[in-house]
Amino acid sequence: MIGGGKTNSGVAVSEFSALRLPVVYACVNRISNPIALFPLKMYRTRPQGGKELVQQGTGRGQHPFASRIGVRPNDLMSSRTVRKTCQAHALLWGNGYVEIERNGRNQGLGLYPLLPDRTAPVRENGDHWFRTTIDGRRHDLDPDNVIHIMDQSQDGFVGISQIAMAREAVAMGLAMETFGAKFFANEAKSGGFLMHPGRLGPNAQRNLTKPNGEKVSNPENPASRLDDQGGLENAHRIKVLEEGMKFVQTTIPPEDAQFLGSREFQIAEIARIFDVPLILLQSHEKTTSWGSGIEQLMIGFIRSTVEPWVDAWEQELNWKLFTDEEKEQGFYVKFNMNALLRGDMKTRADFYQKIFSVGGFSPNRILQLEDEDPIGPEGDEHFVPANMTTLRRASDPNFQPDPNAPSALREDDPDEIEADARAERDAA
């Protein structure tokens, strides 16, 4: 944690105060939401190849945490809440921590997020563990029982906080928020000065007030109040000088005219830290960096920004959640990102048609990718050309295709199909 120290702009910045800046809040949301949205399921590799979905249970090939990991990893929180909370911690503090609850057989049974400002990895005398504080009590946790999601790191043990790295940029954003708010609180006027050729008399000194209307505590030295009337906290307020007063209206300098432009630049500066495209932050940017549409931009965002975080989650979960025996049996968890990466309907239909026609995907596999129910065991067959027969029949030398069978996924002329069938019969 940065500790909320002052920056060059005079604004204190911490991970908590940074969230008050809309662009920071939006960036954290844009990255955390997909992590929380992707289905998270437990699988087991088959000895003969492929994979199978692990069922909830305690029998062979089953796991007591199989269905709960993607739905309810603990009794208090949904899977979405746990993942979004920990991911937000990693984005703000640079480190997200989740404690693994285990049963007597050392199997993972629950996941509980830990506060990042009260948790840290510890290394002493060659040993490594995590130290956390819960309800005022300190606990030392085995490193195998803590999922540690971190961003860039200098030593490989502690992640670097993005807010710490961008504290000046965040502080400028907060300062401009306050500056603009004060401007409108002062009736959208930039204020002015009361000037006098002499010194303030005793009565005028006693009548000096602070910006909030409170009487000045030391009227004998009115000049001491001048410093307190400046700064960001008192932006746009009227400044009191010496006696012989006259009011001088200040004009808006050219720099003030660039206020909106400065705010846009600051949004872009912070978005770069989190690697989020401006268009996803409802910015005024009119062009995209990937392709010509929002779909390609979203795919690029998932690939370049979200997928590295998904990989960090999968590596930590697969290494620490399972026992050595479960790892040998092929247990693993995986995020399903197909929902946001599979493209539009036309693109998917073209892809499925091509890969189906060469025996790559079965009908059930295509339905699975579309989150639809399978059509039954017959949908597991793979098909190849020659009137789209199955691979088993195509490999049988005694099998003769039916020339009257419909040619699936083809748009050939019917006369050409009949001619092809006649040629096959003549050759036989």
Question: Where are the predicted features?
Answer:
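Active-site-proximal structural scaffolding
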Residues: 91, 187, 215, 219, ...
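Short flexible/disordered coil segments
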Residues: 113-114, 129, 300-311, 344-357, ...
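A short pocket-lining beta-strand/turn micro-motif at the edge of beta-sheets
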Residues: 309, 313, 329-333, 362
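Short leucine-rich amphipathic alpha-helical surface patches
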Residues: 310, 317, 321, 325, ...
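Non-transmembrane, aqueous-exposed alpha-helical and coiled segments at domain scale
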Residues: 324, 329, 333, 337-351, ...
